Amino acid sequence: MRKLLKRMSPARIIALGFAATIFIGSGLLMLPCSVRNGVDLKYIDALYTSASAVCVTGLVTVDIGDTFTAFGQFVVAVLIQIGGLGVASMGAGVILAVGKRINLKGRRVLRDAMNLDSGKGIVKFIKSVFLTTAAFELVGAALSFIVFVRDYPPLKALGISLFHSVAAFNNSGFDILGNFQSLSAYKEDVFLNLVTCLLIFFGGIGFLVIREIVEKRFRWRRFSMHTKVVLTMSVALTVGGAVIFRITEDMPWIGALFNSVTARTAGFSTYSLSEFSNAGLLAMIFLMFVGASPGSTGGGIKTSTLFALIQGIKTAATNTSEKAFHYSVPRGVFRKASVIAVMGISVIAVGTFMLCAFEPDIAIRDALFEMTSAFGTVGLTTGITTGLCTASKLTSIVMMYIGRLGPLTIATLWYFTNGDRIKYPDGNIAIG
């Protein structure tokens, strides 16, 4: 086994780690101590729940609060945490906790998993990731407890608060409130809405950005280009989405803000999406497709990819050099962003086609929304998830898996190159 892992690429190790965690999680959820008395849990639903948790999505075919015991809910929370931080990061944390050293291969896997430029200082960075996560989740749980303790006994309110904080920071829209209600009962609670929004926002900008904000003490001029891009795009998408939802939907500003934030990979809902207008759902599909930022707990094609696409289009249209925030943008960045976007659209198109084939009675709007939500690891739904057939559930699982790993990681699993030794003449293609 050890020799096999040494021969495997970092991408394959990461992919195998996520797949193994999903199947182990499904087995744990099938244990009698995980399921409430009188509940007949099918394996496909346990597998779906595990995949949704590990891929930090939040789509569910069974209600977490009504189906699983406290132990089962704990398993789901652990799977969310593993999925959010990444299997490689959690493995590294265990290795460091027992006093072992991480070898060179392990550092390469961690570098790729965390989207880092190099493996230098990787151990220190992993430690900061765990400390940052613990800090945000504990503070989030304490603040959420203030709200939940009004409606539940203290011990149960504590459990709900911890689960909610873990789910929110890891951009996974799970809840244990029961009856598939998510946070609809708290849509007018401004305090809980803002706490949840902040947990989602910081979980979605990435650990590199959080570290830089702290180290450089909020001084904009000292931030790297990556941090400036992530913060600019995150704020722009959040504000833009809130304005659109305020205009297209019948909801107050706090509801519009919450839906704008949660659409970018979190998946909590305070309003029924089945009642949204087509314009509102279209805006939400776009936000779900873009998703969070690199190195974060969220999915989607990432905010930096959208920024690179905008810059590339601007450069091509104006025939000027690629630059932003007083930095020069490498041409390869636009090519990589284009590949990610095209692959993302292609995956969603195939998934939507398959869902329409398996579920002929579902409107294409709902099918497109469901598959974009799965690919973006969001967890929002127009209400069709619980009624999906087994084939549709498996399709959704594959979509969540691809979305969590990322299109490029999936592509590299089958990509081999020995280098091109033959040189060909340049060709020209008419574009546009």
PLM features: what roles do these ranges have?
Residues M1-G432:
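Membrane-proximal intracellular helices of multi-pass ion channels
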